């Protein structure tokens, strides 16, 4: 189980990303449309004004049940070992074990 402080930190980052998403998107669109380099630098400064934690690259997917940040399966939102346990216990409908 991940520390609760790390899980709360991740939730805080998600809120910040959602809050500043439109500002970032509009600034990037302005940069792509303007041909002048000096104006691009001004807009680039505006793009750096939001907090660092509002950047989408700082977000991590976490396991829904344990909060583990690695080995997550997007389709289920679970880490690998929890996914395996749930499939073996038949708790995930439609998921089957592979054999070859």
From Swiss-Prot:
The alphabetized UniProt keywords are:
Chloroplast, Plastid, Ribonucleoprotein, Ribosomal protein, RNA-binding, rRNA-binding
Positions in coiled-coil regions: none
Where does the source fall among the domains of life? Answer: Eukaryota
| A Pfam family reported for this protein in Swiss-Prot or TrEMBL | Ribosomal_S14
Quaternary state and interactors: Part of the 30S ribosomal subunit.
Tell me which family the UniProt entry assigns to this protein. Answer: Belongs to the universal ribosomal protein uS14 family.
Name of the protein described by the UniProt record = Small ribosomal subunit protein uS14c
Task: Name the encoding gene, please.
Answer: rps14
